[in-house]
From Swiss-Prot:
Organism: Homo sapiens (Human)
Domain of life: Eukaryota
Subunit structure: Identified in the spliceosome C complex. Interacts with CCNDBP1.
GO biological process: embryonic organ development; gastrulation; in utero embryonic development; mitotic G2 DNA damage checkpoint signaling; mRNA splicing, via spliceosome; positive regulation of cell population proliferation
GO CC terms, sorted: catalytic step 2 spliceosome; nuclear speck; nucleoplasm; nucleus; post-mRNA release spliceosomal complex; Prp19 complex; U2-type catalytic step 2 spliceosome
Role: Involved in pre-mRNA splicing as component of the spliceosome.
Keyword DNA-binding: no
Coiled coil: 66-91
Protein name as it appears in the record: Pre-mRNA-splicing factor SYF2
Subcellular location as annotated: Nucleus
Family designation: Belongs to the SYF2 family.
Amino acid sequence: MAAIAASEVLVDSAEEGSLAAAAELAAQKREQRLRKFRELHLMRNEARKLNHQEVVEEDKRLKLPANWEAKKARLEWELKEEEKKKECAARGEDYEKVKLLEISAEDAERWERKKKRKNPDLGFSDYAAAQLRQYHRLTKQIKPDMETYERLREKHGEEFFPTSNSLLHGTHVPSTEEIDRMVIDLEKQIEKRDKYSRRRPYNDDADIDYINERNAKFNKKAERFYGKYTAEIKQNLERGTAV
């Protein structure tokens, strides 16, 4: 009887130990899941915070002027230049000479070539600047008519050089040659403008494989890139021998 009782005690203790181990294992797994859940929760909050910051920054960028990045870069460059000038002045050095030491020979040659150009294209900034550049280009093409100048000066005498009391406005009548020259120049400008925005003429004999103009442009683009790969398939479809 004593042996049986001892064996039952051992079995009970073993069962209790296994139950305790199982409970401890379950607690560890639950703790791992909770820790993983907390990590995911923190990651979600961090992602939400970053997304909100990105949305705010994008909204700020959209509200800024179109050329804000270029202006900002220009201002930063000017600030750096001012700081360098102050540093050189504090050291008693000539800023222009110090700046030349930092410029390579290739950059110096390129800069000199750019300075020698009569009407350099500095890139698009706004429509007013583009119009001003065109105005300078057109005025430089005007050739003075010295014969007409001398004739008008002899005709008007001292009044040819106007003062605050002169009343020459509306008295000049352009000649036929001047009007023709202006018309020719305007026609050249219109022709040049049409080359930049040339609309292709409509071909009545061309195959219609589109439903609207946008689809026609897409089909032309697809034909340009994939036409050589689909030529045989199109021919088989037209002959009726496609598999």
